[in-house]
Amino acid sequence: MNGTVIPGTPIAVDFWSVRRAGGARLFFLSHMHSDHTVGLSSTWSRPLYCSPLTARLLHHRLKVPTRWIRPLEVGQSHAVGEEVTVTLLDANHCPGSVMFLFEGAFGTILYTGDFRYSPAMQREPALSGRRIDRLYLDNTNCRPHGALPSRSRAALQAAQLIRRHPQHRVVIGVYSLGKEELLVDLALEFGTWVVVSPSRLEQMRLLELPEVFTTEEGAGRIHAVDVAEIRWDTLVSWNVLHPTIAILPTGRPVKVTHPQIHLIPYSDHSSFSELCEFVKWLKPCSVIPIVKGDMCYASFQKYLSPDHQALPGLGIPKPLQVSVQWQSKTKKQKPVCLVKRAAQHSVPKGVVYEPLEEYIEQSDGLGGVTAPQQNSHESAFCSLEDGICFYDCKEEELSGEQPGGAMAAGTAGQSLVSDEDFPSELPKQYLLTPLNALKQSSFCKALKNLFIRWEPS
């Protein structure tokens, strides 16, 4: 999953595991590629910020309820909560894709998501002359020896390939989102329809693309199919019916399994030289890779701002501080003795034992049996030998006498068992104890002695 929880902020980008998101409470979606939506589904129930086009795709494809989707206009600054301002910038990657420029007490952070650098980005007012404290960079093509042409040059290569095969049907392998611009360019260049599946046609209309797509077989020379369909066996079967060439527009290394499969270096990610140009122009204080792994940091270090040693304090917002302090406090608390002992004995089924107070004191009436400090709600008798405690829960107004005496009922509440049911003066807290718990040997011995004490003389 290509997502990030940004440290020192309440921000998570393309990260949809709430359980692992820590204190993040502001969730952003950069674009709708599947590797950036892992964990995002129709059950999502928190505000989610994205571009308007991504918002439409999100509801259409993943059925995320619209009440949780917060579309933000691209090119404008938006106050999100009380601590963060965000500006969405075109990422030049796929329809609806954006970069996020975050500003707050944590400094200024640019999160590129997946992006293809263009010199036009240097004319973006939100970035021009801006100090960037942290740059989260798409390092997909961070390979010094991996040169890539611009997308316009790659599209020209595809057109030249098609011209060399005038009698062939052309099948182009694409993912569920992306390469739409290439398909439109080729359709207009050759004056033909692009045949697609019904679901893809529905998405093309949602994206409001030019009307060059159809589902009618045989209506056009160019077909757009899922990239997984471009393989040896399908090429064999297609060429039996009609001469066919396949095009894979990708900047990634791919193993070609058929002589009629052609790779065109059309990439929606920045090349290594473009990344260097972008970082050199931006001069961030630090660079952090979005795609985990080797990101050739040394290649960018020389372009960092000379102020990179003077980063602003990455203060944790108050809601995060409270959460961290509470977690720290709970971790430092010592477990009471009975919790430790409970692991050594099976707890009687159907009985719930409340946690004891940390301090216990010796009871005068029972040898070897201790009682914890009592509060106004409950009394308890514990055997330290067996690690078992028994409780007598009462209304707040009930109070206990000295050990060995009977419990007196308060004026505002009554015990569930009256004195008339038990002619002896045996304390009720023992009579209400579960019988299977009373089988503990040391406690039974103490009870036996207690019964002997109260036998009529």
Swiss-Prot record:
Known catalytic reactions: a beta-lactam + H2O = a substituted beta-amino acid
InterPro entries reported in the protein's UniProt record: DRMBL, Metallo-B-lactamas, RibonucZ/Hydroxyglut_hydro
Gene Ontology terms: biological process: double-strand break repair via nonhomologous end joining; interstrand cross-link repair; protection from non-homologous end joining at telomere; telomere maintenance; telomeric 3' overhang formation; telomeric loop formation
Domain comment quoted from the record: The TBM domain mediates interaction with TERF2.
Gene3D superfamilies found in the cross-reference section: 3.40.50.12650, Ribonuclease Z/Hydroxyacylglutathione hydrolase-like
Source organism: Gallus gallus
GO cellular component, one term: centrosome
GO MF term list: 5'-3' DNA exonuclease activity; 5'-3' exonuclease activity; beta-lactamase activity; damaged DNA binding
Enzyme Commission no: 3.1.-.-, 3.5.2.6
A Pfam entry, by short name: DRMBL
Domain of life per record: Eukaryota
Gene name in the database record: DCLRE1B
Organismal lineage: Eukaryota, Metazoa, Chordata, Craniata, Vertebrata
UniProt protein name: 5' exonuclease Apollo
Residue numbers covered by motif TBM: 425-437
Subcellular location, record wording: Chromosome, Telomere; Nucleus
